[in-house]
Amino acid sequence: MNMKLNLKIYGALHFQCLLIIILTGIMSLNSYCQNAELNGTIAGWGTASYSDKLNSMLGIRFVPALTLNFPVKNKFKLDSEISLNTWSSGTFWSGDSTTNDAKIKPYRVWLRFSGDHFEIRAGLQKINFGSAVMLRPLMWFDRVDPRDPLQITDGVYGLLGRYYFLNNANIWIWALYGNNNPKGWEAAGTWPHKPELGGRVQVPLLSGEIAATYHFRQADFRAYNINDSIYFPDPVKENRIGVDGKFDLAVGLWFEGVLIRQNGIKEGWQRYLNLGADYTFNLGKGLSLMTEFFSLSSASKAFIRDDGISFAAISVTYPFTIISSLNAILFYDWKNNDLYNFVNWSWQFDKWSFYLMGFWNPDRFQVYPGMNKTNLFAGKGIQVMAVYNY
């Protein structure tokens, strides 16, 4: 127990030291900064929902961001971003109980060196890719919820390099370190002090593009009960392969497929598939329709049939005016015969945005990772949000 505690403390201190080194490097360049820009987002919201009982929440979020640009000779560019994710909320449960939550944590802390056809970015950053929109098999390093007006998601610590060819092909290479908590669809985090490596190649094809992606890590399943089939005491080598493509034909079409192998796990093969399409109808100011089919399954072999989950998703968007639009998103769980409903009426101004949202969901929200427990967005409810961007 003491050794585990010491490892956790060491890992946390190691991580903080890494962040301090990056911040120190950025701030040491501050005297050479060509220009600095401070911007950010302030959002306040209120939610009322009913599942087994009436619950409500009030909250505020502040995401300040400092962008720095440094002069570099020739055609190169050196810039950085430092931002925080701060929030405070109070949840009021019917009865008398109240739960308060508040946190301040780094959101983005990175330094980037770039040229006309390449970029190298180091630090706490957002890395996402793929063709799908609502249910994304390639959601490996983020947890963006398409219903969230702020599109908030944690970043990952790592080094990312990208090269862009003249024909719009591009190559990505990354190395991640210190991301011990689960991310994306992961059921378990990464083993402490073990790096993650991967890359992606994307090339134009016909009227669109196609890509192949690979990632390797060593997963940590020790948090599970020792009697659980997914428990494993040692680092689990995990290899991921993904392919995706998007094409602009009479309608927009895309696909994403992922195959994951976890050595030593009983059901160590995972398969993800997404097929999607979108089209804008010439009705009024333009009615946009998007639909996706998503499936996820685990098995002891790569391509045998086994139990899993599958969802169908539909998104409809209609702009009433230049500043006002209505969006509806529906998910259908084929296995449990559950229907998830979400409606968002938004108003967009220069600096202000307002949202009126309604949802009608099962008591247990099971669409996205990290939301498998009963939460405030389960059941039926409404949410209002005001956002100020400066």
Predicted feature locations:
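Transmembrane beta-strand segments of Gram-negative outer membrane beta-barrel proteins
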Residues: 33-51, 78-80, 169
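Repeated loop/turn-to-beta-strand initiation elements of outer-membrane beta-barrel proteins
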Residues: 36, 74-78, 117-120, 168-172, ...
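Transmembrane beta-strands of outer-membrane beta-barrel pores
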Residues: 44-50, 84-88, 115-117, 124-128, ...
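Residues that define the transmembrane beta-barrel architecture of outer-membrane proteins
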Residues: 54-62, 102-107, 153-157, 193-197, ...
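Residues on the lipid-exposed face of transmembrane beta-strands in outer-membrane beta-barrel proteins
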Residues: 64-70, 108-113, 159-163, 199-203, ...
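Outer membrane beta-barrel
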Residues: 69-171, 176, 203, 363
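Detector for outer-membrane/organellar transmembrane beta-barrel domains
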Residues: 207, 246-332
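Outer-membrane beta-barrel "beta-signal"
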Residues: 347-353, 360, 376-390
